[in-house]
Amino acid sequence: MLHVIKTQDDPMIKFIKDDPVRPEIPADWRVSKNREVLTLVDENKNPLAMVCVAFCDSIPSSVEELLTDAIAPNTAIFYTIWSYAGGGGKSLIGEAQQYIKDTYDHITRFVTLSPTTELAKRFHTKNGAKVFRQNSDTVNYEYE
């Protein structure tokens, strides 16, 4: 089941501390305007995987660009994802895309802001993404 975190009052926000990719991004920014944290939870509401999403009007090549506010967002940027259970990340990336398609008709693209690691490359390409752009410190993978 998908749980959407939109405010700092959500008890699930405490799991942001486990983010292994972008721990420097504060929790309050992750749930501010045009931003959400999507969590795959089990029947007991325990997190299985988490992904942070920013709705942007361009594709950022760096964290600095990610932090700018969008005027007319049309792209979902998955900028960090982590899992507490095997297969959780794969399930979450698919459910997250479907939720966004069903909820935000103005969002037409799904792109990552990923580290330049083999782990990120394997995860995203195995789950159907293609390299959109190689940047100096990041890679953008695009999902169809």
Regions found by a protein language model. Name each.
Residues 39-40, 50, 110-112, 133:
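A structural signal for short, well-ordered beta-strand segments and their strand-loop junctions
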Residues 130-142:
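Conserved catalytic-core motifs of GNAT/GCN5-like acyltransferases
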Residues 65-128:
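Acyl-donor binding region in acyl/amide transferases
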Residues 34-37:
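Short loop/turn microsegments at loop-to-beta-strand junctions
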Residues 39, 45-62, 77:
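Conserved beta-strand in the GNAT
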